[in-house]
Amino acid sequence: MADNMTTTQIEVGPGATNATINFEAGILECYERLSWQRALDYPGQDRLNRLKRKLESRIKTHNKSEPESKRMSLEERKAIGVKMMKVLLFMNPSAGIEGFEPYCMKNSSNSNCPNCNWADYPPTPGKYLDDIEEEPENVDDPTEIVLRDMNNKDARQKIKEEVNTQKEGKFRLTIKRDIRNVLSLRVLVNGTFIKHPNGYKSLSTLDRLNAYDQSGRLVAKLVATDDLTVEDEEDGHRILNSLFERFNEGHSKPIRAAETAVGVLSQFGQEHRLSPEEGDN
């Protein structure tokens, strides 16, 4: 087991989570106002509806982890999100909210900088994907699956059989694809399973998925902390299935880690986390 392996993640605390949810709620408010003006086309209307469903689900999940005094409804978060937009767009702290201030307002020698060039803002230290190191989470009875010299269909079936033996709760799964003693793929997954009364098992939380290429280089990663998790059971089931499907190409050609990563990251719309070079590997 790769207990001594160093991996990478973005660390997102509860403050950033609240800010993100509130900002997206503000975006939803803008979408709705545009819709009321009959200025939203059909694709835009579809995005509005999907964003609203996702936000309602995410707020419900997030509120469970918050003390009752800090729980907020979607409508309350919309109001805060609109104020955040005013701060971001106009750099006007008087339009803002407590605890949220643009980076330049806190760090510029000139507090009145409405013409700041956003491209000049330095990044927040340590928040790049490759800047924060993390050890794999320790989980009781971690599972390692070695897929050696078998076709992709058999490999996929073995993964499904192994995963179905996982107990409810947190899990760590390491998948190694080995063809003719060449390690062509390694995937490390951390998450949480929920088992339903009918025996159906769904992935409720996907905390991390790391994909490594033939040389052991980490080519892509999807990491969530705090309550940034799979937003509903359907998402979790689809994401896990997308991982399985990468092993079902119908031939014995080694599967590249980048292809696997693209397949999984695309479920979150996170393909941009791969550079073009990594995506082509």
From Swiss-Prot:
Region (G1P2-binding): 1-103
MF annotations from Gene Ontology: protein serine/threonine kinase inhibitor activity; RNA binding
GO cellular component: host cell cytoplasm; host cell nucleus
Location(s) in or outside the cell: Host cytoplasm; Host nucleus
Species, as recorded: Influenza B virus (strain B/Victoria/1987)
Signal peptide residue numbers: none
One Pfam family here: Flu_B_NS1
Motif Nuclear localization signal mapped to chain: 50-55
Region of interest (RNA-binding and homodimerization), ranges: 1-93
Source organism superkingdom: Viruses
Assembly information from the UniProt record: Homodimer. Interacts with and inhibits human G1P2 conjugation by UBE1L.
Keywords for this protein: Host cytoplasm, Host nucleus, Host-virus interaction, Inhibition of host innate immune response by virus, Inhibition of host interferon signaling pathway by virus, Inhibition of host ISG15 by virus, Inhibition of host PKR by virus, Interferon antiviral system evasion, RNA-binding, Viral immunoevasion
Family membership: Belongs to the influenza B viruses NS1 family.
BP-aspect Gene Ontology terms: symbiont-mediated suppression of host ISG15-protein conjugation; symbiont-mediated suppression of host PKR/eIFalpha signaling; symbiont-mediated suppression of host type I interferon-mediated signaling pathway
Name used for this protein in its record: Non-structural protein 1
Functional note: Binds and inhibits the conjugation of the ubiquitin-like G1P2/ISG15 protein to its target proteins. Since G1P2/ISG15 is an early antiviral protein, NS1 may inhibit the host antiviral response. Prevents EIF2AK2/PKR activation, either by binding double strand RNA or by interacting directly with EIF2AK2/PKR. Also binds poly(A) and U6 snRNA.
Predominant localisation class: host cell
